[in-house]
């Protein structure tokens, strides 16, 4: 009996991480076609995670990044459409709310069933591009797999059929469990000359925090004040786009804020579980803070955003929504 042909499309660090365990299982049970859109093309945002998580190379690389956002989105849809016509998958699997997920539009036009993991997340901030992507993909998907009851209720309230909506939880727990020994064994503190609980870890890369000038200035002014108040190193795992923006703005960071290229999966999580606090706008922070609390490595998770699509993390009390202003972040 022939296996069903499944096309799985990824394109960014969070998708690679969250889907890593799922991809391995899908290789066993399906004839899986693994596709990378190329949305994140830097080694430290891409290949290092394939290596850390033991993932095989994608079967196809779409090289979809264009000269601007419009061209990139167009390339993702057009190139995935052509590949689907060529490969004729029985189903499409996507996760999340990145531009790579807009490949679902191509699948819908080709009548290919769409399975969407991380469905139903809502932050109710229409200014965020991810919110637009979520609404588009959720409403054209054939099966929506939600992380929480919150997400399921949002979809049902928007009219999505209940028989198409399931609460599966996040695949992140399996990924972290499988890698916990390697995370704990990382020697990144020694390599960077850091002491446990005597540094903060910073990650700031979201479009609304980096590209909007007022938000950018408010946020990094807050970070400088944080360094001055606590007088400890702040290790900034800095996305290339964020570094480019810092340079272009000529913003002077406090000398205690240390820029570092994006870190690998094991090193970054070792830094999180040993930090005095983690200050981040990362989409994986809610799951990471919840997981490490459950295995005896809790850390204060301070989310530098004004909204969140993960209210279940707030319910658990391991994750705080701080905003980006000086008073909010420090408090």
Model-based region annotation:
Residues 94-95, 101, 116-117, 144, ...:
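A donor-sugar binding/catalytic signature common to diverse glycosyltransferases
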Residues 39-44, 63, 140-213:
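A nucleotide-sugar donor-handling region in carbohydrate enzymes
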